Regions:
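Phosphate/oxyanion-binding active-site loops and adjacent basic polyanion-contact surfaces
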Residues: 9-13, 40-45, 115-122
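Short, well-ordered amphipathic alpha-helices
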Residues: 15-22, 46-53, 124-127
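Short acidic low-complexity segments
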Residues: 61-74
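NAD(P)-binding Rossmann-fold cofactor-contacting core
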Residues: 25-52
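N-terminal Rossmann-like dinucleotide-binding module
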Residues: 3-32
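Redox-cofactor binding/interface segments in oxidoreductases and associated redox assembly factors
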Residues: 73, 79-80
Length: 140
């Protein structure tokens, strides 16, 4: 089974790669693709993730790409780890909230709400691509 990670160029990608590698047998993984719109992030964090994954499971194909079509083609599982707007948007969201004496945390506070609103168009875009290119029974 193929698994695709949307946002695979994030700073925590190596940790996700390690967990996937150690648990690949549980879901029958045969291929893992880390996708990110930032080629720069993929060059750094995606390649670290590839190294970690291949050190544990060299028998499973692992790749990184910034092209969503081949990344999603025939994928059975899709994980989203997107941060639309990058770290700059997170910092701005949290500072705006804090300036108004409000919790700015990126998942539960005003920063999280801002991130969710910013993410909707990207998630809808990927959902259309998943519907078109992923396996018919893909799980998002």
């Amino acid at each position: 089974m193929k698994l695709t990670v949307l946002g695979g160029g994030g700073v925590r990608s190596a940790f996700l790669a390690k967990s996937l590698a150690y648990n690949a047998h549980r879901i029958g993984l045969t291929e893992v693709v880390f996708l990110d719109s930032s080629a720069e992030n993929l060059t750094i964090f995606g390649e670290i993730a590839r190294y970690v994954f291949n050190a544990i499971r060299p028998d499973i194909h692992f790749s990184v790409t910034s092209d969503p079509v081949p990344a999603l083609k025939n994928s059975h599982y899709v994980i989203t780890t997107l941060r639309v707007g990058g770290d700059e948007s997170r910092i701005r969201d949290e500072r705006i909230a804090l300036a108004h004496n409000t919790l700015g945390q990126e998942t539960t506070g005003a920063g999280g709400f801002a991130m969710a609103m910013r993410s909707i168009p990207a998630i809808l875009h990927y959902c259309r691509l998943i519907e078109e290119h992923a396996a018919e029974d893909a799980i998002l």
